[in-house]
Design a protein with these regions (language model features):
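Conserved AdoMet/S-adenosylmethionine-binding subsite of the radical SAM
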Residues: 45-187
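Hydrophobic helix-cap positions at the C-terminus of alpha-helices
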Residues: 23-27, 57, 123, 250
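Alpha-helix C-cap/termination motif
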Residues: 26, 30, 60, 126, ...
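Canonical Radical SAM [4Fe-4S] cluster-binding loop centered on the CxxxCxxC motif
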Residues: 1-14
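Short Fe-S-cluster ligation motifs
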Residues: 15-41
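Well-ordered alpha-helical segments embedded in enzymatic catalytic cores
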Residues: 15, 19-22, 115, 119, ...
């Protein structure tokens, strides 16, 4: 992964728009589209064509657009202006303390946490749509009392429409990132201001509904976006432990690349950039 704060047209905007138009040209989609969600292998707000892409999607589809962002670039006026075209913006704020923020998110050195919080707060004041602040918690990393107190103060400053609490997936593939229980998240939710919801999934899938993973369908899925092993298991209804083992085998064989982002291991095609 490249750690940077430099905005560029990393992929030609025209190519992205052409792919969107190709998708919209299919009248009978497998699933009707309710909302277009813009995310990225890296960070959407680093792309200088973001505003144009959002506006194009809305004009062509008539559907609302949500943008997932790590929030690191929201101190910039140009980024805040481009995000105005969206309907929902979901920035991450996994910690409001510099020490635990660095540990869980491993941000680029150019990212300033105070600037980031101030930028998200300013955007909330200017934005007519919805802002949902997502917080990813990991046990003994960013869930301690001083972390929650700092987070509480930041939320009061930001004033988002929602706060969404999540935790790392179970079983975690990284030794240092352990999940919180539902009880842990409920306790923390009770300490935070505003409209707080727990979005972490603790449901267990029925074992007899699981399928064995097939490399072909997984590689096809990864052509669309990077995924974690639990993402793949959930989306394709695959047995989780077998899926994790297969992904490790595919990585060892060079058929997929591994990358770590926000404490989670993602897989992508080897030719992705």
């Amino acid at each position: 992964l490249i750690h940077t704060c430099e905005r560029q047209e990393y992929t030609p905007t025209a190519e992205i728009i052409a792919e969107i138009d190709e998708l919209l040209s299919h009248e009978n989609l497998a699933k009707p589209i309710d909302v277009f969600t813009i995310t990225a292998m890296g960070e959407p707000t680093l792309h200088t064509g973001l505003g144009e892409i959002i506006r194009h999607i809305k004009e062509k589809s008539g559907k609302p657009v949500a943008v997932l962002t790590n929030g690191a670039m929201m101190h910039r006026a140009d980024v805040r202006q481009e995000l105005q075209a969206a309907d929902i913006v979901i920035p991450s704020l996994d910690s409001a303390r510099a020490e635990s923020f660095r540990k869980i998110d491993r941000p680029a050195q150019c990212v300033d946490l105070d600037e980031m919080i101030e930028g998200i707060a300013l955007f909330c004041q200017q934005f007519s749509g919805q802002v949902w602040l997502e917080v990813m918690l990991a046990k003994n990393i960013n869930d301690q009392p001083r972390d929650i107190e700092a987070l509480k103060e930041a939320i009061m400053r930001i004033k988002p429409d929602r706060v969404q609490l999540n935790t790392v997936v179970r079983p975690p593939l990284e030794n240092f990132a352990k999940p919180l229980t539902h009880e842990d998240l409920s306790r923390i939710a009770g300490q935070l201001p505003g409209n707080v919801e727990i979005i972490a999934s603790f449901a267990k899938r029925e074992h007899d509904s699981w399928r064995s993973p097939e490399p072909g369908e997984i590689l096809e899925m990864l052509q669309r976006r990077p995924c974690t092993a639990p993402d793949i298991s959930e989306a394709l209804n695959l047995e989780p432990a077998q899926t994790s083992r297969l992904m490790e085998e595919l990585a060892d064989q060079g058929q997929v690349l591994k990358m770590i982002h926000q404490g989670r291991t993602y897989y992508q095609p080897p030719h992705a950039h």
